[in-house]
Amino acid sequence: MANLKNLSKKSKSQSMGMHAEVLKGRTQQRFFDSEEAENFYYFGNFDVDFNKRTELDVKNMEAPQANKKIDELMSQGYGTIVIKNPQGKHSLGVGILNKLNLIFEGSLGYFGVGSCDGLTARITGRVGWSCAQNLMAGKVVVEKNAGSSFGAAIRGGDLICKGSVGARTGIDMKGGTIIVGGDAGAFTGFMMQRGRIIVLGNVGINLGDSMYDGTIFVGGKIGSFGSDAVTSDLTSSDKDWLKRKLKVAEINENFDVSKMKKIVAGKKLWNYDNLEPTEKKGAI
């Protein structure tokens, strides 16, 4: 079990393995920076060696049994675990609050690798609804397509789908980055509060509907804009950031980012209580 580091008497929440949030307005939430992340541990975390690798066949296991076995392997110091025969099971790899390389050889069902912090996961097949929901930090890569609500309520980390994703991708996201190599469905970025979404292909109707903050970049066609979603000028820093992200994500590094459209919140929802009745109707 890892020792807790950098604990402060001023923060009992740290000793309980909780994140400290600095709130600015309703949208700005900082959990920890990259330097703090190296020294951050949840209570009960395991010291794992990424070079220590093993395989786990879950063909005849239910999800709770498989997740418990993953926890047991981490307790033995395994830092890289290859999951064989996931066969579209729901809720595999959820709730992992530990640094770990997790490779799924196949497809996942609903809620795969949800509520994780510090996990690096790769899924060679497809994923169902709500993959990586509430991701706090880490990296999740889906090699094929993803279902609806991809990355719902994520707060940090990188979530990558090399194929296409369903409706409501990034719904209620509060941080982090979602990268889609193909198309995205309707209501992408619905009610997003912070973070960034990159879609290289087309997006469906009501893009960014009711978004409060955050940024969406689209390389293809847009079905329609949602309420309070507006276009903004693409800056040189935006282009540099997009190039870096696509390179790290290993998705179409030669994509011409200068042709991408940038969508942000029009900020009407920030001042909703001060709007006239006719303006309120147009803001929601």
Regions found by a protein language model. Give the residues of each.
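Extracellular/lumenal glycan-associated surfaces
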Residues: 98-107, 119-120, 138, 157-158, ...
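Intrinsically disordered, low-complexity terminal regions
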Residues: 1-85, 91-92, 193-200, 204-284
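Glycine- and acidic-residue-rich phosphate-binding/metal-coordinating active-site segment common to enzymes
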Residues: 167, 173-183, 194
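Beta-strand repeat architectures
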Residues: 70-80, 91-100, 111-119, 130-137, ...
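Acidic, glycine-rich active-site loops and adjacent beta-strand->loop/helix elements
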Residues: 146, 165, 184
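Feature marks extracellular polysaccharide-active and adherence modules
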Residues: 84-86, 95, 105-107, 114-115, ...
